[in-house]
């Protein structure tokens, strides 16, 4: 369960980075 939460957090962080690059 913790692994799933960690993976989701990492994916969310990557998604934010991609979104930031797209916004820039």
From Swiss-Prot:
<keyword id="KW-0574">Periplasm</keyword>
<comment type="function">
    <text>May be involved in iron uptake.</text>
</comment>
<protein>
    <recommendedName>
        <fullName>Iron-regulated 31 kDa protein</fullName>
    </recommendedName>
</protein>
<dbReference type="GO" id="GO:0042597">
    <property type="term" value="C:periplasmic space"/>
</dbReference>
<keyword id="KW-0408">Iron</keyword>
């Amino acid at each position: 369960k913790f692994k799933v939460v960690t993976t989701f957090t990492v994916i969310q962080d990557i998604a934010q980075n991609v979104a930031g690059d797209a916004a820039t």
